[in-house]
Amino acid sequence: MGSSLVSVAEQLLKDLQRTYSEIKQIPDDLLIALRFVFGPCALQALDLVDQHSVTCVSSPSGRKAFQVLGGSGRLYTCFTSCHYCPCPAFSFTVLRRNESLMCKHLLAVILSQAMGLCQQEQVSDQQMTHILSRQPEAST
């Protein structure tokens, strides 16, 4: 993807954040622009935001990760700092085919932050280690 498209996407997300903070909705022109820049995953990402599927998980040490409950019920841990999601769509359409800027999960994280609709969850440092290493936590 070209750097000019990335710049357009960044500006679009800034406009969305400003507009949503003022009127608490996304006007049609911004919805159309989202669809144009991000493709079909834009509406899917907005659906995830509407379903409150995005959670910002943070620990006392200051580590932070975002978890998105996908439509299939699978939980994806996304990282905005390095622009990564472990879902198959990210691997295929973003990394391999370079057809999209991001998957719906990563876009949902960015949109939920811009709209102030991200769920918050505090976890211990040990729990965060398990989340970041993608190891299931042992039940005790």
Swiss-Prot record:
Keywords of the record: DNA damage, DNA recombination, DNA repair, Metal-binding, Nucleus, Zinc, Zinc-finger
Superkingdom: Eukaryota
Coiled-coil intervals: none
One GO MF term: zinc ion binding
Alphabetical list of PANTHER family matching this protein: ZINC FINGER SWIM DOMAIN-CONTAINING PROTEIN 7
Family membership noted in the UniProt record: Belongs to the SWS1 family.
UniProt protein name: Zinc finger SWIM domain-containing protein 7
Protein source organism: Danio rerio
Source species taxonomy: Eukaryota, Metazoa, Chordata, Craniata, Vertebrata
